């Protein structure tokens, strides 16, 4: 009703002011409400940005656009962790810095001369349809949402409780984002060659094993020769954990697409995102219970258990259902935060109906060519003489 630019500006402003309120009112319940507002704002911002990218992409460059988007998303996520070192997290300065960066994102959007696209209504599969199409896809997406939300939300809490310095916390969170982005492509290539369920099972059990190893190397770690106390080995095994764990959503999406027609790829992706979101709501709460019962290492115990759940369920599904070869389905790296609008950037989905450019319209209209909207198809234009 109000357009992309106004929606982006409104929710970016809301996100910016919500961050500042954190430093004004320090109360757990108020922060709980503020986090809800932040989540709503970020989903709306992502939806606007990804639908805009989708509208500006053609069938020839959708994959490239998605790859660049992935690099920017994970890269800035990793670099952003180092902002913790500008000031103590106990002070109000970090909140101001986040608010400033969020507000700065408005400048290029508000000054653009490009015409904003129209929103597309994307209907997600309901949970029953999604489960019938791919039980393993839906269940693993639900569990993985639980894993991911706990991982990104409580990693800093775990590191703080293990007496990591602020710089070391920044390094750990940076390694999580960057190694996860780098792992997308080799893991995806392997999944295009072998049964995706087998790749998912090996990845989940690999992540579970490295989570347990991380527990044993997280306290006193020494460089070869006993040079100095160091967290080098923890970083090393945490990178291996990220390599196994972070490509999971893209693998789950590709696996689900193996069992459905190309026309349903976007709807299935939206359904998986919904299942992922349901799991994500419970992740931090469940993980915090483990950390209360076991101590800080309950963080990795939680990750071990839920990765194992996915792995064992995958083994069960391989016994009751044969793999299929869908020529329309292939692995495409996708961030976990992607919205249904962004899923359309997946080059394996249906071709985008590309309307004539404004310049072509102007030239043809000079020659007596008239345009009219086709009543049977949304957003499609045809030429009539």
Walk through the language-model features, giving the residues of each:
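Helix-to-loop junctions at the C-terminal end of transmembrane segments
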Residues: 1-4, 88, 183-195, 291-292
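Intrinsic disorder in cytosolic terminal tails and internal cytosolic loops
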Residues: 117-124, 317-385
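Intracellular juxtamembrane helix-capping segments at the cytosolic ends
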Residues: 44-57, 246-260
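Cytoplasmic helix-loop-helix junction between adjacent transmembrane helices
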Residues: 36-71
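Loop-to-transmembrane helix entry/capping segments in MFS-fold secondary transporters
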Residues: 59-69, 166-167, 260-272
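Structural signature of the two symmetry-related core transmembrane helices
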Residues: 6-20, 99, 198-213, 304
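C-terminal membrane-cytosol helix-exit motif in multi-pass small-molecule transporters
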Residues: 84-85, 99-119, 310-318
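C-terminal transmembrane helical hairpin of 12-TM major facilitator-type secondary transporters
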Residues: 197-249
């Amino acid at each position: 009703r109000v357009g992309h630019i106004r929606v982006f500006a409104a929710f970016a402003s809301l996100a910016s002011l919500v961050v500042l309120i954190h430093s004004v009112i320090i109360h757990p319940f108020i922060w709980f409400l503020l986090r809800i507002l932040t989540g709503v704002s970020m989903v709306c911002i992502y939806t606007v940005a990804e639908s805009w990218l989708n509208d500006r992409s053609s069938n020839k460059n959708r994959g490239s656009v998605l790859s660049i988007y992935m690099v920017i998303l994970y890269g800035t996520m990793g670099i952003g962790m180092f902002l913790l070192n500008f000031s103590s997290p106990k002070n109000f300065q970090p909140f101001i810095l986040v608010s400033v960066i969020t507000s700065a994102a408005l400048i290029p959007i508000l000054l653009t001369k490009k015409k904003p696209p129209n929103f597309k209504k994307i209907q997600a599969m309901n949970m029953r349809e999604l489960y019938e199409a791919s039980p393993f896809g839906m269940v693993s997406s639900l569990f993985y949402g639980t894993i991911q939300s706990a991982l990104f939300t409580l990693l800093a809490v775990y590191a703080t409780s293990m007496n990591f310095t602020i710089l070391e916390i920044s390094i750990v969170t940076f390694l999580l984002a960057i190694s996860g982005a780098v792992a997308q492509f080799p893991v995806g290539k392997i999944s295009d060659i072998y049964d995706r369920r087998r790749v998912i099972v090996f990845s989940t059990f690999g992540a579970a094993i490295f989570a347990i190893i991380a527990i044993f190397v997280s306290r006193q770690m020494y460089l070869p020769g006993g040079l100095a106390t160091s967290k080098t080995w923890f970083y090393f095994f945490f990178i291996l954990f990220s390599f196994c764990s972070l490509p999971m959503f893209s693998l789950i999406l590709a696996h689900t697409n193996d069992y459905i027609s190309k026309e349903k790829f976007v709807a299935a992706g939206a359904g998986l995102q919904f299942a992922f979101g349901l799991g994500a709501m419970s992740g931090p709460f469940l993980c915090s219970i483990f950390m209360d019962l076991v101590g800080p290492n309950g963080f990795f115990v939680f990750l071990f258990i839920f990765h194992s759940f996915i792995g064992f369920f995958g083994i069960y599904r391989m016994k009751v259902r044969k793999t299929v070869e869908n020529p329309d389905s292939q692995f495409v790296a996708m961030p976990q935060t992607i919205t249904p609008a962004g899923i359309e950037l997946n080059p394996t989905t249906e071709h985008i109906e590309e309307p004539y450019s404004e310049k072509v319209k102007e030239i043809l209209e000079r020659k007596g060519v008239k345009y009219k909207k086709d009543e049977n198809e949304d957003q499609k234009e045809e030429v009539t003489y």
